[in-house]
Amino acid sequence: MQMSASKLKDVLTTGEVAKICNVAPRTVSKWFDSGTLTGYRIPGSKDRRIPLSQLIKFMKHHGMPLNGLMTGATRVMIVDDEADIVEVLERILEGEAKYEVEVAKSGFMAGITAEKSRPHVILLDMHLKDIDGREVAKAVRSNPDLQLTKVIAMSGRMSEVELKALIGSGFDGYLKKPFNVRQVIQTIEDATHVTY
């Protein structure tokens, strides 16, 4: 779902709200049913609709980032301390794939940035200078607000077998460095396809 600012709807479905807020559609339904998020039901149907104005009010009240609101684009956070890799990934993901990209150059900054931007996907280098990538993934998995965030391991040192072993232990995919543009985009698409 891509929505540009000029095409932004006045009323959104629970699925659209879920994608913007990076939560499951059932979470949006719970917000609606509890009265936390104001909207209305389609007469004769169980379908719910959320006016854009109410969603913005809700997001501001709960400190949610509004950056996903205008585009509905997939939000990707790159966590890597190698500047050349970050630069290439950022250029590819923003320019070619039209993703919204945030960058964190340390495990510490990854926590702060993830909390603020609530990415759909985190591309996580396993060999950060300040912390092991597994610890960052563990922190993401323990944060209730990031339960739907997909974590993709990146490494040039680990073997294919070691990287595959990470699947199911907090990671949703992996990229072996060096990788090409198609591999990066395909891995992100594969990881997000299950949820969205």
Predicted features and spans:
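Short helix-start
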Residues: V11-E16, L37-M64
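Two-component/phosphorelay signaling modules centered on CheY-like receiver
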Residues: A83-E102
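Acidic, metal-coordinating helix/loop segments flanking the phosphotransfer/catalytic sites
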Residues: V103-V121
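Acidic catalytic/metal-coordinating carboxylates
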Residues: S106, D132-K138
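C-terminal output helix
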Residues: F179-I188
